[in-house]
């Protein structure tokens, strides 16, 4: 069963005519790659206000995500990368909300195709791309390493980064499987994420939230540790 929570989400604020908010929906399932299966709990983030919302990842169970969407207009379903545990509810959510784009970076299309053969994503994500929702703007950072097409989304007005599986509390995402590379993820984190303000809150695709300031001092430790 999915669960809703705040996960350290900042307080809501007024944005235009409706109150801006960030919702967290946790869902459970399996991550499957290279013939292995792992039980996981995913963070699905919904960003917007009472009128419209952007869905960041749609994992495992569409029902709790749809419940959190409620009657809001969905701007897009953005997949931070193509691993099954971040996209396997995307089509079911899409089927409920109607004609909205499912967005994924082209470099992760081969991962998408492992799950969905007959239908591709609608919108290719690109570095520097932006999404407007609830009076706020989210910018896309291409952060390869965990997968070739991994992305993060930065909500600058709130000082919030949605990091997918690129950065977690305690270090970078795993790079010991197909299509991943440790030096690449370190470069992504160093050049794209650790340059953000130290107070920026990091909401990852799994586990607890953190801040850039909490993680930045440990970069050399991560490099020494390796993947």
Where are these regions (language model features)?
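Conserved beta-strand hairpin/beta-sheet module of binuclear metal-dependent hydrolase folds
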Residues: 19-72, 152-164
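An N-terminally biased module of ancient metal coordination in phosphate/nucleic-acid-related enzymes
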Residues: 7-8, 13, 70, 79
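Short polar/charged helix/loop
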Residues: 4, 9, 109-114, 182, ...
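Divalent metal-coordination and catalytic microenvironments
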Residues: 47, 57, 81, 93, ...
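Short acidic-hydrophobic surface loop/beta-edge motif
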Residues: 15, 25-27, 47, 127-133
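Active-site neighborhood of phospho(di)ester-bond hydrolases with catalytic His/Asp-centered motifs
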Residues: 55-57, 75-83, 102-105, 142-145, ...
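Metallo-beta-lactamase
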Residues: 53, 139, 148-227
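Active-site HxH/HxHxD metal-binding segment of metal-dependent hydrolases
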Residues: 39-40, 53, 60-137, 217-225
